[in-house]
Amino acid sequence: MRKIVTEDLIYEILSAVEEIPEGEVATYGQIARLIGRDKNARLVGKVLSRAEDYGDYPCHRVVNHSGRIAPNFPEQKDRLLAEGVAFKNDTCVDLEKHRWEI
């Protein structure tokens, strides 16, 4: 069954992303839990992949559950580094240091 993605849901996700402080990151799952949709981390990712259609949001601050950055978002790493976010390796943020504590 397909999930219906309404404009309200899109803006709810984007509003949650807007709350992530500079220099910190959240996971897709954290954002899903924050909006009361615990099992919808993939839906969050889908919405964020189209976020530029809705305005300027700090989507670069959202990573997967292990801290990995998005493979199709080449400027994500540079933006995070510019905010002082440390990486454990080439593609993974150090979540112990930079995970947003909600």
Tell me what each language-model feature is.
Residues R2-I102:
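Nucleic acid-binding interface residues in structured DNA/RNA-binding domains
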